[in-house]
Regions:
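Flexible inter-domain hinge/linker segments at boundaries of tandem extracellular adhesion modules
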Residues: 24-31, 71, 82-99
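Extracellular beta-strand/loop-rich beta-sandwich domains predominantly from IgSF
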Residues: 34-84
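Short acidic/polar alpha-helix capping motifs at helix-coil junctions
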Residues: 16-17, 31, 47
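Solvent-exposed loop segments of extracellular immunoglobulin-like
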Residues: 13-26
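Short solvent-exposed capping/turn motifs at the termini of beta-strands
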Residues: 11-13, 71
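Structural beta-strand segments of beta-rich domains
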Residues: 3-7
């Protein structure tokens, strides 16, 4: 049995525009995400929003879900992670990166 997980990750204040990458454990799940961005002209920075939709099951319990913001100015990236607790009621998480 699987359950749909919806998670949003937001990177603000990037220049140049960041790309958001998703991993679940060691698995790249970025292809399950949609990304949109806006350019803030006054500061010449970008806000990027990535919405991940993924079917998780019991085997995903305890796995680390990571959103990583990367651009040429920060090639090592900035990231945040949560540990999945698949046995509990599902919630929607929102990650916000600020410069």
């Amino acid at each position: 049995m699987t359950k749909r997980l919806d998670v949003t990750c937001t990177a603000t204040g990037s220049r140049p525009r960041a790309t958001l990458q998703w991993t679940l454990g060691q698995k790249d799940v970025t292809s399950n995400a949609t990304e949109q961005f806006s350019h803030i002209t006054a500061s010449d920075t970008y806000t990027v929003i990535s919405d991940l939709t993924y079917s998780v099951g019991k085997s995903d319990n305890g796995q680390m879900l990571t959103c990583k913001a990367v651009n040429v100015a920060a090639s090592s990236g900035v990231q945040t992670s949560i540990t999945l607790n698949v046995s509990c009621k599902f919630k929607k998480y929102v990650f916000i990166f600020r410069n």
